[in-house]
């Protein structure tokens, strides 16, 4: 892989446009897996995605220049899959399976273009929406977030000279390497990069991936970023996301269909994928409700990804459920990925060691941790909690409840309706930092 002097690159402002998103596969692998399912099973569904900044104190429209934002969004719309990328997607094995992407899907994908966007300002925030066919709008989620986050980072760094930038990145590299050295203490660790959506920059994410590859080669299982996986000869990792049950629930016309929605999309998923891709994300409408009503066959899936409950608490509930269902947790997999940093990874690993198979998806605190690295504090380098969520499907509002009420999305009246239907037990407020 080409080595880049990141500090020098950041300081060099001579490019007419320095693209943030360099490829359509500069995205999370699970977006492609979900895209194939949407293309195959839900081709006529429309879905609207919207940017949601949960860190209200950061007024993005007052930080990021609108002209620069439009230029980056417009550039992303010019991207098409290259011949090299098509060959790699068609010929590579993923999760031990050859040709996971159907030839007809890849033919369609070869002509794919990101759809148009709507951008405006309201109360110091950007209103960024993507309307259209679900199989098109879904692909905006990751590039939109990457663009917003990197433009914010670039704005924060504009006033710094080359020497200060050099010190900043030297300290950030040292800080990252200290984390890697601590992870070496865990003998059977399995960890992957989940940091694309809220990364400091593409180049920094690439450096962090290289650091994991170099520092913990036996523990590092791959990256969710498809472009980096291809370029670095790594495994592309990822399963599925909340948008699947959110859309299925939005489309439900009866209470019976609403109750079955979280399991319907799992059946759909199982039609296309298997093995280690059979990982349940249970918290879209609350993990307690999901487990209480889950069919027997869900217990036969490979594992769960507890996403919004504290990792130890969430993991224990799933282990208890497996035992209740007569399954041996030692043969099952838990993937932890919610706002993790080294302390939480180590504590969670030690708590569950020997009781269950574990994997860790390391996100924002891997690819966007510059706290204490600048000579003077730069608030613009602190990560924010920003998401791009589906808010509507076929004109019907979409909702996410989560195990953490602070992560809930949707119209208040619809959120209340879902809470009455699914229940609110075991939902606990805790601060959302990333």
Curated annotation (Swiss-Prot):
Annotated EC: 6.3.4.21
Q: Which UniProt keywords apply?
A: Ligase, Phosphoprotein, Pyridine nucleotide biosynthesis
The known PTMs are summarized as:
Transiently phosphorylated on a His residue during the reaction cycle. Phosphorylation strongly increases the affinity for substrates and increases the rate of nicotinate D-ribonucleotide production. Dephosphorylation regenerates the low-affinity form of the enzyme, leading to product release.
Catalytic activity entry: nicotinate + 5-phospho-alpha-D-ribose 1-diphosphate + ATP + H2O = nicotinate beta-D-ribonucleotide + ADP + phosphate + diphosphate
Which biological process annotations from GO are given for this protein? NAD biosynthetic process via the salvage pathway
Q: In which pathway does it act?
A: Cofactor biosynthesis; NAD(+) biosynthesis; nicotinate D-ribonucleotide from nicotinate: step 1/1
| Gene Ontology molecular functions | nicotinate phosphoribosyltransferase activity
Q: Which GO CC terms are listed, alphabetically?
A: cytosol
Extract the InterPro entries matched here: N/Namide_PRibTrfase, NAPRTase_N, Nic_PRibTrfase, Nic_PRibTrfase-Fam, Nicotinate_pribotase-like_C
Q: Which residues carry this modification: Phosphohistidine?
A: 242
Note the PANTHER family from the entry: NICOTINATE PHOSPHORIBOSYLTRANSFERASE
Q: What does this protein do?
A: Catalyzes the synthesis of beta-nicotinate D-ribonucleotide from nicotinate and 5-phospho-D-ribose 1-phosphate at the expense of ATP.
Q: Which family does it belong to?
A: Belongs to the NAPRTase family.
Q: What is this protein called?
A: Nicotinate phosphoribosyltransferase
- Which species does this protein come from? Rhizobium rhizogenes (strain K84 / ATCC BAA-868)
Originating gene: pncB
């Amino acid at each position: 892989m080409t080595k880049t002097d990141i500090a020098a690159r950041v300081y060099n402002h001579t490019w007419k446009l320095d693209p943030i998103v360099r490829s359509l596969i500069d995205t999370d692998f699970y977006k492609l897996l979900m895209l194939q399912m949407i293309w195959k099973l839900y081709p006529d569904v429309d879905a609207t995605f919207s940017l949601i900044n949960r860190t209200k104190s950061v007024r993005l429209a007052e930080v990021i220049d609108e002209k620069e934002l439009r230029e980056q969004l417009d550039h992303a719309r010019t991207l098409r899959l290259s011949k090299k990328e098509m060959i790699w997607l068609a010929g590579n094995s993923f999760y031990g399976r050859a040709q996971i992407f159907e030839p007809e899907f890849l033919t369609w994908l070869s002509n794919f273009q990101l759809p148009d966007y709507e951008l405006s300002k309201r109360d110091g925030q950007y209103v960024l929406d993507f309307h259209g066919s679900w199989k098109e709008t879904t692909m905006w989620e990751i590039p939109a977030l990457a663009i917003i986050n990197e433009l914010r980072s670039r704005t924060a760094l504009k006033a710094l000279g080359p020497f200060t930038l050099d010190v900043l990145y030297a300290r950030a590299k040292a800080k990252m390497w200290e984390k890697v050295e601590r992870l070496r203490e865990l003998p059977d660790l399995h960890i992957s990069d989940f940091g694309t959506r809220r990364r400091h920059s593409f180049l920094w994410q690439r450096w962090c991936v290289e650091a994991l590859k170099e520092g913990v080669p036996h523990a590092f299982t791959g990256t969710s970023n498809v472009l980096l996986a291809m370029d670095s000869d790594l495994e592309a990792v990822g399963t599925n996301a909340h948008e699947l049950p959110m859309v299925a629930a939005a489309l439900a016309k009866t209470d019976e269909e609403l109750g079955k929605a979280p399991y319907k999309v799992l059946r759909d998923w199982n039609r296309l994928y298997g093995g280690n891709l059979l990982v349940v994300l249970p918290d879209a409408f609350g993990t307690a409700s999901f487990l209480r009503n889950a069919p027997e066959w869900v217990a036969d899936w490979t594992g769960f990804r507890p996403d919004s409950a504290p990792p130890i608490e969430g993991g224990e509930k799933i282990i208890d459920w497996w035992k209740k269902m007569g399954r041996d947790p030692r043969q099952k997999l838990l993937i932890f990925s919610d706002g993790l940093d080294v302390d939480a990874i180590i504590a969670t690993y030690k708590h569950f060691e020997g009781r269950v198979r574990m994997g860790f998806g390391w996100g924002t605190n891997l690819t966007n941790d510059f706290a204490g690295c600048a000579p003077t504090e730069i608030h613009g380098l602190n990560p924010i909690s920003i998401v791009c969520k589906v808010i509507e499907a076929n004109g019907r509002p979409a909702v996410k409840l989560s195990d953490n009420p602070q992560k809930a999305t949707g119209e208040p009246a619809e959120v209340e309706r879902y809470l009455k239907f699914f229940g609110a037990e075991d939902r606990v407020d805790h601060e959302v930092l990333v």
